[in-house]
Amino acid sequence: MTMHTTMTTLTLTSLIPPILTTLVNPNKKNSYPHYVKSIVASTFIISLFPTTMFMCLDQEVIISNWHWATTQTTQLSLSFKLDYFSMMFIPVALFVTWSIMEFSLWYMNSDPNINQFFKYLLIFLITMLILVTANNLFQLFIGWEGVGIMSFLLISWWYARADANTAAIQAILYNRIGDIGFILALAWFILHSNSWDPQQMALLNANPSLTPLLGLLLAAAGKSAQLGLHPWLPSAMEGPTPVSALLHSSTMVVAGIFLLIRFHPLAENSPLIQTLTLCLGAITTLFAAVCALTQNDIKKIVAFSTSSQLGLMMVTIGINQPHLAFLHICTHAFFKAMLFMCSGSIIHNLNNEQDIRKMGGLLKTMPLTSTSLTIGSLALAGMPFLTGFYSKDHIIETANMSYTNAWALSITLIATSLTSAYSTRMILLTLTGQPRFPTLTNINENNPTLLNPIKRLAAGSLFAGFLITNNISPASPFQTTIPLYLKLTALAVTFLGLLTALDLNYLTNKLKMKSPLCTFYFSNMLGFYPSITHRTIPYLGLLTSQNLPLLLLDLTWLEKLLPKTISQHQISTSIITSTQKGMIKLYFLSFFFPLILTLLLIT
C-alpha cells in the first residue's frame, strides 16, 4: 500500500515543476511546449503502476497529511481519496491530455504565445485531477473553480475576436449559476454535518434533505451543460480546437457528472432526486441530438454530441448506476478527443473552413484523418466492439431492465438513434462525394505531431473500452439472462439511426422538399433557446426598465411638481381670496327680497 500511495503522489506532484519553472524563468524558451508534453507523457507512464497495483489490491486509500485550518469544531485538512474512480480516471486524463498537447504542437505552431497556452493546458489538467482526487468538499471546490477559470482563459484565447470573448463570458456566467447550488450544498453540509468529508457526511446524513441534493444537481447541470444551462457548450467552440478537445473529453464538462458520482451514496436514497436526474438527462440527450442533426459547423456537431452523451451519463446516474456513468466518462474521452483532433486537422488543412457543406471527398486526400474520424463517429454511435459500445450497450441494457420511467427510457432510445444519424451524416458530407472546397487548397497531413496523437487515440477508441470494462464492475450485478429483443435494443436503435441518416442524405441530394419544415428551423436554431434567453428576454427587460422610470418620471413627478402643483395653488388661492361664487340668480334674489320687504313695510 505504501508503494501504491507513493507512486500516486509522485504522479500528481510530477506535473507541478513545469509551472514552477515559469515563475523562476518567465522568459521561456521555444522548448517549453515539448518539455510540458514530455512531462505529461512521463506522468502517464508512471500513473499506470499505481493503477495496476490498485486493481490487484482492490483497496481504497485516503491520504491526509496536512491540516489547512482548524476551528473550534471543524478541522480542515488536505485529503486525497484513491478509489476506483480517481485511480481509473487519472491515466485516462493524462493519456488524452498528452495526445492533445502533442496535437497542439502542430495546431498552435504559429501562435506567438504557445508557451503560455501549454501552461494553461497543464493547469487545466491539474485542477481536474485535484477535483477527481479530493476527499472533502472544500478541496473539490478548489478544483471545481479551477477548471471554470481555466476554461474562461482558454475559450477566450483568441481575445481579439469578439465571439471568443462573448463565449468565454457566457461559459463563466452559466457556471456561476451552477456554483450557487454548490455553495448552497457546502453551507448546508457544514451546518448539519459539521464536516465536508464525504464519509462523515454519509454516516451522519444517510437521508439528507432535498436542499443540498438539489444544490448538487444544479451545480452538475451548470458544469455539465444540461438543458437550461447548456448554451455555453456549443459557444465554447470559439476557442482553439485543442481547447475544445480537452474541455469536452476529460476535464470540465465531465466534472458535474463526477460530482454526482462522488455524492451518489447520499442521493441514491432520494427517489425525487433520482427521478429529476433521470428526466433532466433524458431531455438533454434528446434535445442535443436533435440540434446536432441539422448543424453544419463540424465542431458544433461534435460539441452537441458531447452534450448528448453528458445527458446519457445523467440518465445512468438517474437509474442508480454511477459505475456505468463513470465507465462512459472514460470511454467517451478517447473518441471525443479524437473527433475534435480530426475536425481540427480538416479545418486547418482547408484554411479554417468549418462548414461540412463545403467539404467532401476527403477520404482520398486525408486518409488517416478520415479513417480516424470514421472510427470515432462509429464509436460515438455505439457500433459493436468499439470503445463506445461497451458503455452505451450496458447503459441501455440496464435502463431496459430497471424499474424506471418509461417516458425517459423512450426518449433516451430515440436520442441514441439520432446519435447514429448525425454521426453518419457527418461522415457522408465530410469524407465522401465530390470535393466542394477550392481546388488550390494545399492539404498535407504528413506531420508526425498531427498523426501520432490521432493514431494513439484511434487505438484507444478501438481497444480501451474492452480493457476498462473488465476493471469496472457495476454497483449491482446484471441480470444473467434477458430476452433477445432487449439485448439487441442498442444495436437496433443504432442501425435505425444509420438508415435515417442515409434517407436524409438521399432527400438532400434529390431535393425532395422545396422548403425546410418547421422542425428543421427548431433544430437548426437550437430550439430558439439562445434567441429567446439571450435576445428577447433581455430586450424586454431593458425596455420595461427604460419605460417604467420614464413614465413614472414624466407622468407622475414632473407633472405633479409643475403643472398640477401650480394649478392646485391657483385654485386654492382663488378660493381663499374670493367669496364670489358666480351664482347670479341667488345674488339677484338676495337683492330683490329686501326691496320687496321694504315696500311692504312702507305701504
UniProtKB/Swiss-Prot annotation:
<feature type="transmembrane region" description="Helical">
    <location>
        <begin position="241"/>
        <end position="261"/>
    </location>
</feature>
<feature type="transmembrane region" description="Helical">
    <location>
        <begin position="87"/>
        <end position="107"/>
    </location>
</feature>
<feature type="transmembrane region" description="Helical">
    <location>
        <begin position="301"/>
        <end position="320"/>
    </location>
</feature>
<keyword id="KW-0225">Disease variant</keyword>
<keyword id="KW-0429">Leber hereditary optic neuropathy</keyword>
<dbReference type="Pfam" id="PF00361">
    <property type="entry name" value="Proton_antipo_M"/>
</dbReference>
<feature type="transmembrane region" description="Helical">
    <location>
        <begin position="272"/>
        <end position="292"/>
    </location>
</feature>
<dbReference type="InterPro" id="IPR001516">
    <property type="entry name" value="Proton_antipo_N"/>
</dbReference>
<feature type="transmembrane region" description="Helical">
    <location>
        <begin position="171"/>
        <end position="191"/>
    </location>
</feature>
<dbReference type="GO" id="GO:0042542">
    <property type="term" value="P:response to hydrogen peroxide"/>
</dbReference>
<dbReference type="GO" id="GO:0001666">
    <property type="term" value="P:response to hypoxia"/>
</dbReference>
<keyword id="KW-0813">Transport</keyword>
<protein>
    <recommendedName>
        <fullName>NADH-ubiquinone oxidoreductase chain 5</fullName>
        <ecNumber>7.1.1.2</ecNumber>
    </recommendedName>
</protein>
<keyword id="KW-0249">Electron transport</keyword>
<dbReference type="InterPro" id="IPR010934">
    <property type="entry name" value="NADH_DH_su5_C"/>
</dbReference>
<feature type="transmembrane region" description="Helical">
    <location>
        <begin position="211"/>
        <end position="233"/>
    </location>
</feature>
<dbReference type="GO" id="GO:0005739">
    <property type="term" value="C:mitochondrion"/>
</dbReference>
<keyword id="KW-0830">Ubiquinone</keyword>
<comment type="subunit">
    <text>Core subunit of respiratory chain NADH dehydrogenase (Complex I) which is composed of 45 different subunits.</text>
</comment>
<feature type="transmembrane region" description="Helical">
    <location>
        <begin position="407"/>
        <end position="429"/>
    </location>
</feature>
<feature type="transmembrane region" description="Helical">
    <location>
        <begin position="144"/>
        <end position="160"/>
    </location>
</feature>
<comment type="similarity">
    <text>Belongs to the complex I subunit 5 family.</text>
</comment>
<dbReference type="GO" id="GO:0009060">
    <property type="term" value="P:aerobic respiration"/>
</dbReference>
<keyword id="KW-1274">Primary mitochondrial disease</keyword>
<dbReference type="GO" id="GO:0045271">
    <property type="term" value="C:respiratory chain complex I"/>
</dbReference>
<dbReference type="InterPro" id="IPR018393">
    <property type="entry name" value="NADHpl_OxRdtase_5_subgr"/>
</dbReference>
<comment type="function">
    <text>Core subunit of the mitochondrial membrane respiratory chain NADH dehydrogenase (Complex I) which catalyzes electron transfer from NADH through the respiratory chain, using ubiquinone as an electron acceptor. Essential for the catalytic activity and assembly of complex I.</text>
</comment>
<feature type="transmembrane region" description="Helical">
    <location>
        <begin position="38"/>
        <end position="58"/>
    </location>
</feature>
<feature type="transmembrane region" description="Helical">
    <location>
        <begin position="325"/>
        <end position="347"/>
    </location>
</feature>
<feature type="transmembrane region" description="Helical">
    <location>
        <begin position="458"/>
        <end position="478"/>
    </location>
</feature>
<dbReference type="Pfam" id="PF06455">
    <property type="entry name" value="NADH5_C"/>
</dbReference>
<feature type="transmembrane region" description="Helical">
    <location>
        <begin position="482"/>
        <end position="502"/>
    </location>
</feature>
<dbReference type="GO" id="GO:0005743">
    <property type="term" value="C:mitochondrial inner membrane"/>
</dbReference>
<dbReference type="GO" id="GO:0008137">
    <property type="term" value="F:NADH dehydrogenase (ubiquinone) activity"/>
</dbReference>
<feature type="transmembrane region" description="Helical">
    <location>
        <begin position="582"/>
        <end position="602"/>
    </location>
</feature>
<keyword id="KW-0999">Mitochondrion inner membrane</keyword>
<feature type="transmembrane region" description="Helical">
    <location>
        <begin position="122"/>
        <end position="142"/>
    </location>
</feature>
<keyword id="KW-0867">MELAS syndrome</keyword>
<keyword id="KW-1133">Transmembrane helix</keyword>
<dbReference type="GO" id="GO:0015990">
    <property type="term" value="P:electron transport coupled proton transport"/>
</dbReference>
<keyword id="KW-1278">Translocase</keyword>
<feature type="transmembrane region" description="Helical">
    <location>
        <begin position="370"/>
        <end position="390"/>
    </location>
</feature>
